[in-house]
Curated annotation (Swiss-Prot):
SUPFAM superfamilies: HydA/Nqo6-like (SSF56770). This is NAD(P)H-quinone oxidoreductase subunit K, chloroplastic. It comes from Lemna minor. [4Fe-4S] cluster binds at C43, C44, C108, C139. HAMAP family: NDH1_NuoB. One of its GO terms (biological process) is photosynthesis, light reaction. Pfam families: Oxidored_q6 (PF01058). Its cofactor is [4Fe-4S] cluster. NDH is composed of at least 16 different subunits, 5 of which are encoded in the nucleus. Keywords: 4Fe-4S, Chloroplast, Iron, Iron-sulfur, Membrane, Metal-binding, NAD, NADP, Plastid, Plastoquinone, Quinone, Thylakoid, Translocase, Transport. Its EC number is 7.1.1.-. GO terms for cellular component: chloroplast thylakoid membrane; respiratory chain complex I.
Length: 225
């Protein structure tokens, strides 16, 4: 907490009294009581689950896992985010009260990971859907790295001005079709545009004749490139 010195008050008040601004007091209280909403969809979440044990004891940072987004101010995305899960993730973020923060944990969350090059259903970066405060790369990151990310987020909160945080709030969200992103309005109502969330048919829904016909139409030159 940033302290402010008042010479006239220091002469009459005991040393146990701390003088500061309301903004710094608010930041200090929030960074010491972050309540994360755990959003784990893949193996990265297993590393985060290790923090709950006695070896790392993340309770010392004031972290209290919550199962409801309305009681959380931090969402930690760990694992692959598919286009089918994209509206659910955005809705969870919209339901969290301000101010709220996001930690993107793992390569799959940040860039799509190994699914980003040849996958029709993976979002290439969770920051296309929600604003991210701290990026935590790794496959998967170690629990010590998660603690370091939480420490960096706490430092960011301690220097934060509340008015600037509200002013820079993201108003638009991005949805993807075949990795082409389209900006849409905020979806507080929960009414999603189903056209933007169209999923390509799986191979089980395609007949064998159509499958081999599409394969035969691709030249060997395209396959090499």
């Amino acid at each position: 907490m940033n302290l402010i010195e008042f010479p006239s008050l220091d002469q009459t008040m005991p040393n146990s009294v701390i003088s500061t601004t309301l903004n710094d007091l608010s930041n200090w209280s929030r960074l010491s009581s972050l309540w994360p909403l755990l959003y784990g969809t893949s193996c990265c979440f297993i590393e985060f689950a290790a923090l709950i044990g006695s070896r790392f004891d993340f309770d010392r940072y004031g972290l209290v896992p919550r199962s409801s987004p309305r009681q959380a101010d931090l969402i930690l995305t760990a694992g692959t985010v598919t286009m089918k899960m994209a509206p659910s993730l955005v809705r969870l973020y919209e339901q969290m009260p301000e101010p709220k923060y996001v930690i993107a944990m793992g390569a799959c969350t940040i860039t799509g990971g190994m699914f980003s090059t040849d996958s029709y259903s993976t979002v290439r970066g969770v920051d296309k859907l929600i604003p991210v405060d701290v990026y935590l790369p790794g496959c998967p990151p170690k629990p010590e790295a998660v603690i370091d990310a939480i420490t960096k987020l706490r430092k960011k909160i301690s220097r934060e001005i509340y008015e600037d945080r509200i002013g820079s709030k993201q108003e638009n969200r991005c949805f993807t079709i075949n990795h082409k992103f389209h900006v849409q309005r905020s979806i507080h109502t929960g009414n999603y545009n189903k056209e933007l969330l169209y999923q390509s048919p799986s191979t089980s829904e395609i007949t064998s004749e159509e499958f081999f016909r599409s394969k035969s139409s691709i030249s060997s030159h395209k396959l090499v490139n």
